[in-house]
Amino acid sequence: MLKSNLNIDNRFSLIGIVASQPKRHQSPNGIYHCQFVLEHRSIQEEAGLSRQAWCKMPVQMSGNQFREKTQSITVGSQLLVVGFISSHKTANGLSQLVLHAEQIEFID
């Protein structure tokens, strides 16, 4: 986006394969949560050259509207996940980016 029309936004989309068994639980205040790791692999063009892109991204889905859809997520499911990213502290105190899903779509 041009400097003269700068909007701050946080949108992130990633296609990948579920690489960890989803963890599903309900918080004490009744909000449903599902967490898993999405593994992405692709070929991207950068500076006129092809390069492999690869990452593992933790995904957090929160809200009762996701309960039914997340029941079908298993290791090996291919998904498109759209949401925003935020930093979380891991158990050992390191910062880690997490994709907070707002939409998911199964890819055949």
UniProtKB/Swiss-Prot annotation:
Q: Could you tell me which InterPro entries the record lists for this protein?
A: NA-bd_OB-fold, Primosome_PriB/ssb, Prisomal_replication_PriB
Gene Ontology biological process terms in this record? DNA replication, synthesis of primer
Subunit structure as annotated in this protein's UniProt entry? Homodimer. Interacts with PriA and DnaT. Component of the replication restart primosome. Primosome assembly occurs via a 'hand-off' mechanism. PriA binds to replication forks, subsequently PriB then DnaT bind; DnaT then displaces ssDNA to generate the helicase loading substrate.
Q: What is a single cellular component term in the Gene Ontology annotation?
A: primosome complex
The name under which this protein is listed is Replication restart protein PriB
Role according to the record:
Involved in the restart of stalled replication forks, which reloads the replicative helicase on sites other than the origin of replication; the PriA-PriB pathway is the major replication restart pathway. During primosome assembly it facilitates complex formation between PriA and DnaT on DNA; stabilizes PriA on DNA. Stimulates the DNA unwinding activity of PriA helicase.
**Gene name for this UniProt entry:** priB
Record keywords: DNA replication, DNA-binding, Primosome
| Family in the record | Belongs to the PriB family.
Q: Which GO terms describe its molecular function?
A: single-stranded DNA binding
Cited Pfam families: SSB_1 (PF22657)
Q: Where is the SSB domain?
A: 8-108
